[in-house]
Amino acid sequence: MQSWATDGSVFFLGRSRPPLSPRAMIPAIFLMGPTASGKTELAVRLADALPIDIISVDSLLVYRHFDIGSAKPSLALRQQYPHALVDIREPDEPYSAGLFREDALHCIALARERGRIPLLVGGTGLYFRALECGIDTLPPANPALRQSLMALAETAGWPALHQRLATLDPEAAAGIAPHDRQRIQRALEIILGSGQTISGARHWQGTFPGPLYKIILRPPRSWLHQRITQRFDVMLNEGFLDEIADLSARHYAPELPAMRAVGYRQYFTWHDGLCSAAEAYQAALAATRQLAKRQDTWFKRESAHYYLDPSRDDASSLLLQMATRPRQGEVHSIGWDNG
């Protein structure tokens, strides 16, 4: 079994801080990648080889009842390989990057106290950023400006406001879908209210406790698109349409984040009789591919110690190599061609 160095030789993030206890020096591992890139499969294979506690980093998996369309690990799998921060909120209960950071830090501390490795697995880049760097300090909400944007959206439509956002802040617009009204509204509210781009107005406050290193999955696009289609077909066979009907019967507000999640949003439109099943299927696939593209764009801006191509047959063994030999300040591309 791998024994972890406790002499400070592993990679350290953040400002200098008092010496940590030996167990606090167990490095946390971030396993990050776009949707359908095989993160869960790789995580459980790693858990077969190392004393790992899996902690989910997914803004949709926190919600109960959203199971099939979110590709949530099955209950049977979670009984064998427990996943923290899954099914911890009702869909109408608020959750945020700040709350996630509090919950994740607690889970990391518990894992280290037990002498286990915290493995944080997911695709929600903002949650990873909040956990690593602290909470951002964006300007507060501006109700008057928000009301004005809502009125404009009613006449011009959210895609038009997204185009306006792309003119004012191309970087922010690239990470937001044209129909994601909540994020478009907030982005424009910040930019128009502060006169700054999102990155200019954002200031991160906080540090990560103890050592940390990051592994980013970089799948080939054609392979990922094929997996997205295959996974969606599996979801439909597993009863995704029944899940849509069940969620509709619960009468959740349509503007809730979970209700507007990729895949769900398109099939709620079908359930309401506004499109055909074939149209919903194609729209859901297209939206999922766009989500994967946005996630990949986010992770390309992240620094990491390792990059891994999950399409490789030996991806699990390569991941084990990465997880058992952290290097101070080095970057490796094991099993991934960045050329």
From Swiss-Prot:
Task: Write out the entry's keywords from A to Z.
Answer: ATP-binding, Magnesium, Nucleotide-binding, Transferase, tRNA processing
EC class (word): transferase
Q: Which residues make up the annotated site Interaction with substrate tRNA? A: T124, R146
* Positions annotated to bind ATP: G33, P34, T35, A36, S37, G38, K39, T40
Q: Tell me the Gene3D superfamilies matching this sequence.
A: 1.10.20.140, P-loop containing nucleotide triphosphate hydrolases
List the catalytic activities from the record: adenosine(37) in tRNA + dimethylallyl diphosphate = N(6)-dimethylallyladenosine(37) in tRNA + diphosphate
A GO BP entry is:
tRNA modification
Q: Name one Pfam family in it.
A: IPPT
Cofactor(s) listed: Mg(2+)
Q: Which NCBIfam families match?
A: miaA
Q: Which HAMAP family match?
A: IPP_trans
Q: Which proteins does it associate with, and in what oligomeric form?
A: Monomer.
The record's comment on protein family reads: Belongs to the IPP transferase family.
Identify this protein by name: tRNA dimethylallyltransferase
Recorded source organism is Acidithiobacillus ferrooxidans (strain ATCC 23270 / DSM 14882 / CIP 104768 / NCIMB 8455)
